[in-house]
From Swiss-Prot:
Keywords: Kelch repeat, Repeat. Kelch repeats lie at residues 138-184, 185-235, 237-274, 275-323. CDD domains: F-box_AtAFR-like (cd22152). Residues 27-79 form the F-box domain. This is Putative F-box/kelch-repeat protein At3g27910. InterPro entries: F-box-like_dom_sf (IPR036047), F-box/kelch-repeat_ARATH (IPR050354), F-box_dom (IPR001810), Kelch-typ_b-propeller (IPR015915), Kelch_1 (IPR006652). It comes from Arabidopsis thaliana (Mouse-ear cress). Pfam families: F-box, Kelch_FKB95.
Amino acid sequence: MTFVVSVNAANPTPKVKKPTVARSIPSPTSLPLPDEIIVNCFAYIPRCDYPSLSLVSKTFNRLITSIELNIVRSLFQRTENVLYVALRFSHEEDPIWYTLNQKPYKNKSNSCIHKLVPLPSCPSLPCWGSSVIAIGHKIYVFGGCINGDMTSNVFVIDCLHGTFQFLPSMRVPRGCAAFGIVDGKIYVIGGYNKADSLDNWVEVFDLEKQTWESFSGLCNEELSKITLKSVVMNKKIYIMDRGNGIVFDPKKGVWERDFLLDRDWVVGSCVIDNMLYTFGFDSVKRIYRVRVYDPSVRVWSFVKGIEDIPKMDGTLGSRMANHGGKLVILLNLDKNGGTELWCIKIALERRGQQGEIWGKILWYNLVLTLENSSTIVECFDITI
């Protein structure tokens, strides 16, 4: 897929890699059927079968990688969740996008092999510090560091239509800001010294109007300018910095500490059904396991049924993601200066009167091998 750039003239152009211009599908094809009919047929085929189809002919490969196919799938309500992963190989380089695909062959157990495949046409992020949020088929990017300086730029990547557009800038440059979407509005919090501009500590972007709104509420809790993680549960924004766990209720304008959240929350976590999943060490069994936090009762517990997760001895730099309601763990393992990325997919369910969370491993395998070390910058679902 290639991406088309659309620039808002009121904003300066960020120094990001410029994508190539999309090309329309050439016609006619060598097949007896018009391209439009073939694309309509492909729209009803699961994406996991596309790698096999792409090997049939050059025409099939061209149509499967076209933007038109994504659009038709959306019109026919045949969209699927695709895992997007951004990897950075040094602090001076912009991250590179990958997607989790299935290879067109099966292993000895007759199950499909999953691989991370580079997506070079997708516009890159600033080298570090961006606040990135995925909504449907779009990726919104706020601020970050470009050539050593923080930026106030905002842009959106439309993965369905293959477009790239600059949006109105924030009032102040930000890096490593907290963020969260509540009721169609994106709240961007911090990311700079609060004393420099107290009035702009929180900015609100209206997704429908595509405009920024002011926010009058002040943060009465001690929050660092650099946040490590932020998530949304039950329409509240949970923020983790280097020392505190802060809960922000945008509707009430209330900020408060959550000391229980501080204890076990780590960076590589995710939210599924308003529950926070993260990595945790079981001091009794002396192994790393998946922990879950229920904000409604403020209780941590271990996910049952998956005590023996492979490769869980190395969780530093690893990430979790909500992949269509399933828990995906992407393990970033150092191998003699290189990197092995292992992916584990887990189905979750509540059981019993106590509502215990149980998991079942659906599959796990090596999805990418790299000669150099890497950092997982982003890992989330896109609907296309």
